[in-house]
Amino acid sequence: MDEEMKEKEFINLENRIWKTYQSRIITATRLLNNSKLLDFYSTIYTICLTLLSVFTLINGDKLINYFSVFISIIVMGIVFYGNTMNYKDRYINMKDNYLKLGNLYFKCLNERINKNYDIEKIYEEYSNLLNTVENHSKYDYLSYRLNDINEKGKVPLLQKIIYWFRKTMLLILKIIIFVIPIFFVIVSFIRMI
């Protein structure tokens, strides 16, 4: 293989490593945010459940009892979901992986500066890193592409629309999940007065 072809192949591999590195950073951030969000929801729902229990003791209203049961089921679901998704451990593994990918990327830059293209060795290390942790999602890769100045213009309009639609729907869902227990507490408090 001539030197020019070797350099092009090496740059292509270097770009793949960079894209994977950036996508994994986005994935790790999403996993950490999901973990924090679940903790936040657990706290909000537990506080609201405690308030509903106190209202039930004071008032004994059946509707408040139903609200309490409903909130209890949601709390149980949140805890079960949080335990099965294991966001914190997945975040730690993903962060470790992207840090190693970052080191590999800088190793590539150094090899390119020195014109020492050990493609097989770099590719093997890259493949090993890909196999040590779950893959990033298509959504995370799309997030990378939409935030990268060189990739942004290459994303088709339909993918942009789907991305922003999903992002909007997730925000609406998060707001609804946040508002539900507060609504029940307010209604219960009004019924108590």
Give the positions of each predicted feature.
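Alpha-helical transmembrane segments and their immediate juxtamembrane boundary regions
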Residues: L32-I92, I161-I193
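Conserved non-transmembrane functional hotspots
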Residues: D2-Y41, F80-N83, Y87-I175
